[in-house]
Amino acid sequence: MSDTPHQAARHDRLTRLFHWSMALLVAAQFAIGWTMPDVHGTAPPLGLVLLHVNLGVLLLLIAVPRLLWSGARRPIAQVEQPRALAFVANATHTLLYASLIVVPVLGWLNANGRTWHVGLGSGFSLPAIAAPHTLGATIGELHSAWATVLAILIGLHACAALAHRFVMKDGVLARML
């Protein structure tokens, strides 16, 4: 690789908007998730817990069209890199996309199990996808565990972006800015 970055094709505006809006929402979700009070039983969500639920709905509502857009658009030219690195990048992106759906869906199942309203305020509600059940706490633990996996994947993604910028100097980071 050369020491001077070359111009790599940029992602389109909608892709960048999806990426950065979800990045901000996920960062907010982690900040809230780490500071909100523990959830017990079926007591209705209030304060930070309610905000966490509402932002989770918003995250899911953005993740689905983002996935559809990602599948529908023409991919931009890939930067040349070793096969093993390309495999790791593709695997990480696949797991990131999956986690951005799985974590909110587990939260939704957790909320359903606790008989909580899941929506954005009083004007929009998601349908129940599970009947009230006694597994709410267990599903809540799965939600937290998968969120930890998501945090690790985000860390890998950020480290890779910085490595592309400062070590490989191949313009990959600039494609999403």
Annotate each PLM feature:
Residues 1-177:
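Membrane-embedded alpha-helical bundles that constitute the cytochrome b-like, heme-associated redox core
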